């Protein structure tokens, strides 16, 4: 499955959320990560993130698709993210 994770969390937790997410996904833009995950790894990621966030003030969204091939990606402006991640 292909997962896009988008988060908006309290400043105190940003670094911790990013550290957890980068164990599973590639950073592509501020507060956005994406990549292929097995269902088991996806569940582990959600569990780790849910233990860290404050559900009263933080928001984390997961967009889950069967494959990266089911959508088109267009970037305007600067490409951000980790080197070596190619679409």
Curated annotation (Swiss-Prot):
Pfam families: CRISPR_Cas2 (PF09827)
Binding site for Mg(2+): 8
Uppermost EC category: hydrolase
Keywords: Antiviral defense, Endonuclease, Hydrolase, Magnesium, Metal-binding, Nuclease
Enzyme Commission (EC) number: 3.1.-.-
InterPro entries on file: CRISPR_associated_Cas2, Virulence_VapD/CRISPR_Cas2
UniProt KW Nucleus keyword: no
Required co-factors: Mg(2+)
Keyword Nuclease annotated: yes
GO terms for biological process, alphabetical: defense response to virus; maintenance of CRISPR repeat elements
GO terms for MF: metal ion binding; RNA endonuclease activity
CDD domains: Cas2_I_II_III
Job description of the protein: CRISPR (clustered regularly interspaced short palindromic repeat), is an adaptive immune system that provides protection against mobile genetic elements (viruses, transposable elements and conjugative plasmids). CRISPR clusters contain sequences complementary to antecedent mobile elements and target invading nucleic acids. CRISPR clusters are transcribed and processed into CRISPR RNA (crRNA). Involved in the integration of spacer DNA into the CRISPR cassette. Functions as a ssRNA-specific endoribonuclease.
Record family assignment: Belongs to the CRISPR-associated endoribonuclease Cas2 protein family.
HAMAP family in the cross-refs: Cas2 (MF_01471)
Complex formation: Homodimer, forms a heterotetramer with a Cas1 homodimer.
Name listed for the protein in its UniProt record: CRISPR-associated endoribonuclease Cas2
Protein encoded by which gene: cas2
């Amino acid at each position: 499955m292909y997962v896009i994770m988008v988060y908006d969390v309290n400043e105190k937790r940003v670094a911790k959320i990013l550290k957890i997410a980068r164990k599973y996904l590639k950073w592509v833009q501020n507060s956005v990560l994406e990549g292929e995950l097995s269902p088991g790894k996806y569940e582990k990621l959600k569990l780790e993130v849910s233990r860290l966030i404050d559900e009263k003030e933080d928001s984390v969204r997961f967009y889950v698709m069967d494959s990266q091939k089911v959508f088109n990606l267009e970037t305007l402006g600067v490409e951000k993210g980790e080197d070596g991640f190619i679409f």
